[in-house]
């Protein structure tokens, strides 16, 4: 392992290497403990937590495409109280370096969520999900507005002064570097690029949308070139350190992200079919 995979820091948080599990596919983190040695990874980003429990979207939630995966999960989660009391301590006890993904439907819930996070002794790093495309409120509707990105990031920085603040950005805008600048102005220590692209599919040969919400988030190899472009542009702008997420399916993909200027990489959808990939990337870098 060379210096690209060795220990590094994002703001006040130290990580053992540059290979993370992305938010979403790994659930609360411990679901993959029997398949992945979580202690070997730089970090494990939890599924997104909201202040109140969410049941998620009704109907079908996952749909495979020829080069990726559409999801309409809808931020299903147990809510802040159970997460900070049960799920997060269990992940920390496993030896994983936890990065907590925080989301919100509105400003009041977001402030309450930050207060709950501030009371937890286990929150050293957070990734603000300002970019989920498959919810009615919050998510991408916040993250596509630079002024709101700055406001939400600044609030997190003030509420969690001893934690690393990472803003996860949406690619569904004209210029993602504008969002990176807004996150930096709000005090973010880094940005994650990217979240899913908006897409849809029709069932069979008919005209019936696969998902009840019609549109969903596309991940997997199909979005790798888009993610690589976003990482390249943010890195070249010098605005913020950037964590790469989107379409990694091989060691080669991870190396390309690092060559494009990423400080770390997140593996997500690929672990559904290849849970050994994150550790192989750790070994190869």
Report each predicted region and the residues it spans.
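C-terminal helical cap(s) of enzyme catalytic domains, especially alpha/beta-barrels
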Residues: 38, 56-66, 202-216, 258, ...
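N-terminal capping/small domains of soluble enzymes
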Residues: 1-98, 104-105, 281
